Amino acid sequence: MLDAERQTLNKRMILPTTYMGSVEWYRQFLANPSAVQIEVMESFPKQTYRNRCTITTPDGPLTLSVPVKRADSKQLTRDVEISYQQRWQHQHWIALVSAYKRTPYFDYYADFFRPFYKQETRFLVDFNEKIHEVIHQLIRNSEFKIQNSKFTTDWQGVNLEPCFGNGQSILDTLFEYGPETILKLNNVNSIKLV
């Protein structure tokens, strides 16, 4: 094995698939996106962020879970199918609107997320990957310009400061800071994101 290949392998980072990943997950991912491999060959563990996310609401943290079909305990993550027996998509969308409608960037980004709650995707990893692609694009798109902005930043005492810990979804930060999300993630600690 060549030294360059060995260095590349040593720099690889394996992350689990996540449903609207946490701030911490995106900080790890954005530190070196080309070195990240999403783990899909593991046995699917229950009660993890692979099919859950935690958002901040006025009443405190709210966990949203994507229901999945389970064949057996040894089922690989890549084979986990989403269950549509419940109206979870409608419930999740209502929760997102309720939690974020008063944040500065929700109106600008909502249309990027709405389709995920209208259409069905068979496999959880595919669903997560599609959402991740949108989030990554929005975070990295420094040329995103808000045209004819009319929103006010006077929130009259409402604390909309996103939580950077406790597994909170990246959506808290994205809807609050919009194109400045990458800058806010850089300020969490001294790791410089590329």
Predicted regions and their residues:
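Residues lining hydrophobic/aromatic ligand-binding pockets adjacent to catalytic sites
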Residues: L2-V194
